[in-house]
């Protein structure tokens, strides 16, 4: 078990601990639960779906990287496939506050990059901020997404974001978590191809500036992130943050990164290179390259 889970795990009910122990045994537990695992945990713990999600929130919050605020937020995105995806907020010392990943973004980005096609609900241990409410409004689940908070009855995003502005106001038809393939040819080595593949699935209907990032760890594991734009612009999630999020959720740390590749167009209206390189260098990675999309 990864050390970050030990405190939260020890506070769970005994029957839930027994059911979770085999799942968490891998130090690189991927911070997600398959539909089958969720069913097993419900059966062994006697908890219904909502109660189980609340019980597991401390494990999601344990994934947070909060070197600045020391305020851990955890989220669990529940996919329409039945798979659950953990998320935790991330802060990056030496970078800028704008590079921060919120817990809801972490869980949602996690689900999207794992290939989930839509979300039914999200469970969070603190009220979503306005930034996250706007981020969630980019999803194909729209304002019907259910939000579960401790001590409150569930509400939809519509309740938390009245008079909402979103992609439909800009006549955007393809939404975040809809399947997308921008058709860039895969070329180069495995890491370069992974970055291009990440760019192929990015969501960029406002700037038409595709980008993707691939990070290679010292053990050869590769994590990718795809660019995810938002109708309100500022809640946009850069591709590096998506990749760092997956790396962290899988139990890796920044010193594990040995190489990074950014894929983007040289003539795109928005360029990720400077921000990507600056953040990676702040985290100790200097082996950074860029491949230009055709």
From Swiss-Prot:
Zn(2+) binds at residues 102, 129, 132. Binds 1 zinc ion. Substrate binds at residues 89-91. Its cofactor is Zn(2+). GO terms for molecular function: cytidine deaminase activity; identical protein binding; zinc ion binding. Coiled coil: none annotated. Keywords: Hydrolase, Metal-binding, Zinc. The keyword Repeat does not apply. It holds the Pfam family dCMP_cyt_deam_2. The active site is at 104 (proton donor). Transmembrane segments: none annotated. The keyword Ribosomal protein does not apply. It catalyses: cytidine + H2O + H(+) = uridine + NH4(+); 2'-deoxycytidine + H2O + H(+) = 2'-deoxyuridine + NH4(+). GO terms for cellular component: cytosol. GO terms for biological process: cytidine deamination. Its EC number is 3.5.4.5. Residues 48-168, 186-294 form the CMP/dCMP-type deaminase domain. It is an enzyme of class 3 (hydrolase). Homodimer. Belongs to the cytidine and deoxycytidylate deaminase family. NCBIfam families: cyt_deam_dimer (TIGR01355), PRK09027.1 (NF006537). This enzyme scavenges exogenous and endogenous cytidine and 2'-deoxycytidine for UMP synthesis. This is Cytidine deaminase. It comes from Citrobacter koseri (strain ATCC BAA-895 / CDC 4225-83 / SGSC4696). The lineage of its organism: Bacteria, Pseudomonadati, Pseudomonadota, Gammaproteobacteria, Enterobacterales. The gene is cdd.
């Amino acid at each position: 078990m990864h050390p970050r889970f030990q405190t939260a795990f020890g506070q769970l009910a005994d029957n839930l601990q027994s059911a979770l122990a085999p799942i968490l045994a891998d130090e690189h537990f991927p911070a997600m639960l398959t539909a089958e695992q969720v069913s097993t945990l419900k059966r062994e713990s006697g908890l219904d779906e909502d109660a189980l999600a609340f019980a597991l929130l401390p494990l999601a919050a344990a994934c947070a990287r909060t070197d600045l605020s020391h305020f851990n937020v955890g989220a669990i995105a529940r996919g329409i496939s039945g798979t659950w995806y953990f998320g935790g907020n991330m802060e990056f010392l030496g970078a800028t506050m704008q590079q921060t990943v919120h817990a809801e973004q972490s869980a949602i980005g996690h689900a999207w990059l794992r290939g989930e096609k839509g979300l039914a609900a999200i469970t969070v241990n603190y009220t979503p901020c306005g930034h996250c409410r706007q981020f969630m409004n980019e999803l194909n689940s729209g304002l019907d997404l259910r939000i579960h908070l401790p001590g409150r009855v569930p509400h939809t995003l519509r309740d938390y974001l009245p008079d909402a502005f979103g992609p439909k106001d800009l006549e955007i038809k393809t939404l975040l978590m809809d399947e997308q393939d921008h058709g860039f040819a895969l070329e180069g080595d495995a890491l370069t191809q992974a970055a291009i593949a990440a760019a192929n699935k990015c969501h960029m209907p406002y700037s038409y500036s595709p980008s993707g990032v691939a990070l290679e760890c010292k053990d050869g594991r590769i994590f990718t992130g795809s660019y995810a734009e938002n109708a309100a612009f500022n809640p946009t999630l850069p591709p590096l943050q998506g990749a760092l999020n997956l790396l962290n959720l899988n139990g890796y740390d920044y010193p594990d990164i040995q190489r990074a590749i950014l894929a983007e167009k040289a003539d795109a209206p928005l360029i990720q290179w400077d921000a990507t390189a600056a953040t990676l260098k702040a985290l100790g990675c200097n082996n950074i390259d860029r491949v230009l999309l055709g």
